[in-house]
Amino acid sequence: MATPQSIFIFAICILMITELILASKSYYDILGVPKSASERQIKKAFHKLAMKYHPDKNKSPDAEAKFREIAEAYETLSDANRRKEYDTLGHSAFTSGKGQRGSGSSFEQSFNFNFDDLFKDFGFFGQNQNTGSKKRFENHFQTRQDGGSSRQRHHFQEFSFGGGLFDDMFEDMEKMFSFSGFDSTNQHTVQTENRFHGSSKHCRTVTQRRGNMVTTYTDCSGQ
C-alpha cells in the first residue's frame, strides 16, 4: 500500500516532468518560424541556421549542440506526419516510449541526413574545394552520350544558384537531382559559341544556361 510520502514524491516527479516538457523550446522557435510556416519557409530557415551553426564553420563550444537542436527541429517539421503529431502532442509525442523516436541516441539513429557530404560537395567551408570536391560535384551531373553523337561535357565553367550565395540551396538541389542529363529537349538559351577546326574534326565550344545553371561543353563531329 502506498504511503502518503511515496504518493507525494510521485506527484512531485510527475510535476517536474510536466514542467520540463512545457519548458522545452518549440521546434518552431528553434527555427525562428511561425507555426503556420510553409514547407519552403521551414526549409529556408533550416538552411540559414545550419550554415551558421555547422561545427565545421562555427567553432564556438555550443555550436554542435545548437546544430543538432536545429537538425532535430527540421527533421520533425519537414515531415508532414511528424509535424502533425508534434502540433497535436508537442514534445511528448517523441519523448514517450510509444513515440516515433526518443531522446538522445534514438534521434541519432533516426536522423540520416549527411550534412558533411552536403556541404563538402559544395566546398562551402574551404575544404576539398579543388579536385576531390569538383569530381564529386561533376559526378552528380554526369550525362549520358546522345545516340550517335560524340558530344561530351568536359567541365562546368560556372555554377550559380542566383538570389545570393546558396539562398535556395535545398530547393535548387531538388530540381537539379530530378533529371539525369541535359537532353536536347531541355536545353534553353545558348550564351556563346566558339568554333575551331582540327585536322579531322570540326569542333565548337558551347555555353548554355538552364535555369540558374550554366554549363560549357565541346561538341565535335568528324568530317
Curated annotation (Swiss-Prot):
InterPro entries: DnaJ_domain, DnaJ_domain_CS, Hsp70_co-chaperone_J-domain, J_dom_sf
One MF annotation (Gene Ontology) recorded for this entry: protein-folding chaperone binding
Modified residues (Phosphoserine): 133
Main location: endoplasmic reticulum
GO cellular component: cytoplasm; endoplasmic reticulum; endoplasmic reticulum lumen; endoplasmic reticulum membrane; extracellular exosome; nucleolus
Coiled coil: none
Tissue expression pattern: Widely expressed. Expressed at highest level in the liver, placenta and kidney.
Keyword Chloroplast: no
Compartment(s): Endoplasmic reticulum lumen
J domain ranges (all copies): 26-90
Record has Oxidoreductase as a keyword: no
Function, as annotated: Co-chaperone for Hsp70 protein HSPA5/BiP that acts as a key repressor of the ERN1/IRE1-mediated unfolded protein response (UPR). J domain-containing co-chaperones stimulate the ATPase activity of Hsp70 proteins and are required for efficient substrate recognition by Hsp70 proteins. In the unstressed endoplasmic reticulum, interacts with the luminal region of ERN1/IRE1 and selectively recruits HSPA5/BiP: HSPA5/BiP disrupts the dimerization of the active ERN1/IRE1 luminal region, thereby inactivating ERN1/IRE1.
Name assigned to this protein: DnaJ homolog subfamily B member 9
Source species: Homo sapiens (Human)
Organism classification: Eukaryota, Metazoa, Chordata, Craniata, Vertebrata
Gene name in the database record: DNAJB9
